[in-house]
């Protein structure tokens, strides 16, 4: 059986932290910034941690 390939799209979107968690970026950051407050835009710049419900599925997608 051939080796499993990692999901290339997921590999580009998620990074593993030193403690083993998965880091992601926020959505709603590509355009339409005039409708968003400065506070909302500032919060969107920060990264976020993948939730526990999605962790296992995404971990399997990016496993090499």
From Swiss-Prot:
GO terms for molecular function: structural constituent of ribosome. One of its GO terms (biological process) is translation. Transmembrane segments: none annotated. One of its GO terms (cellular component) is cytosolic large ribosomal subunit. Pfam families: Ribosomal_L35p. InterPro entries: Ribosomal_bL35, Ribosomal_bL35-like, Ribosomal_bL35_CS, Ribosomal_bL35_sf. Residues 1-26 have a biased composition (Basic residues). Keywords: Ribonucleoprotein, Ribosomal protein. Residues 1-42 are annotated as: Disordered. The keyword Ribosomal protein applies. Belongs to the bacterial ribosomal protein bL35 family. This is Large ribosomal subunit protein bL35. The lineage of its organism: Bacteria, Bacillati, Bacillota, Bacilli, Bacillales. The gene is rpmI.
